[in-house]
Amino acid sequence: MGKSTLVNRIYREKTELCVCREGDYSPVDLAWCTWMSKEEYEVVLQKYAEIRDEIIKYTIEENGHFVIAYTKIITDIPNFHKDLEQYEIYNGRKNFAEWKEIVFSRFEKFRGTGYLFECAFFQNIMEDLILFHELNDEEIVEFYHELFARVDKESFRLFYLYSENIEEVLQVVKKERSDNVGNEMWYPLMMNYLKDSPYGKKHGYQDFEDMVTHFRHRQMLEMRVIEEVLGECAIVLPAKEWELEEVLAR
């Protein structure tokens, strides 16, 4: 039972919550969404005039920037999604100073309640810090000290799924995320993502063992942030054994 399962189970009991899954528009996270100037947005509207209305439907303007939840747009236009991917802020597409300012400002401005976010605080940010901006462990912990200082702590709770056996979890994910004839879909994409990152190239990432090493390192860092930064604002749950009643009681 992973992150999406946890989110779905919580929402089933708490339908009043506003759920922001990966790819949805989110007031804090920008994964799978664009971050564009007005000029860039106008170019995209002109270039893809045949789906202009769909693009507008999935666009939110934020103080002169345009956020398109572009993966929600279903189209057979060749390379549409690949084209809009270039306007994301993740995977090293922004220099560190600019990226940090965007991340910090969105968390600082957000003061809403009743939201349930998926992957917004750790996964997407942590991967960028490790793989693309190549911060060391101490710098990453300090980054989270600075970020958490900008968060409304009264309304913040982080549910963290912890696994004792990262390798076993990854083997299950490899198998589950395959097509109908057993071809692995997730693993090759994730392996290429790791191999092609600056960190992956520097450390010679090539195979499954390297992936296991990466996720162990990431989990260790996330647990450090929980212990040294978040404290009681985080609830650590066993990845396969959590009880919904315990989650809802928090």
Question: How would you describe each model-predicted region?
Answer:
Residues 4:
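Walker A/P-loop
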Residues 11-69, 127-129:
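Conserved substrate/cofactor phosphate-moiety recognition/catalytic segment
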Residues 24-26, 120-124, 164-167, 241-243:
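Short, solvent-exposed loop/turn segments at secondary-structure junctions
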Residues 54-152, 162:
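Glycine-rich phosphate-binding loop used to anchor ATP phosphates in small-molecule kinases
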Residues 109-113, 146-159, 218-236:
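A structural motif corresponding to the C-terminal end of an alpha-helix
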Residues 117-120, 137-193:
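Conserved phosphate-donor/acceptor-positioning beta-strand/loop module used by diverse small-molecule
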Residues 185-250:
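NTP-dependent small-molecule kinase module
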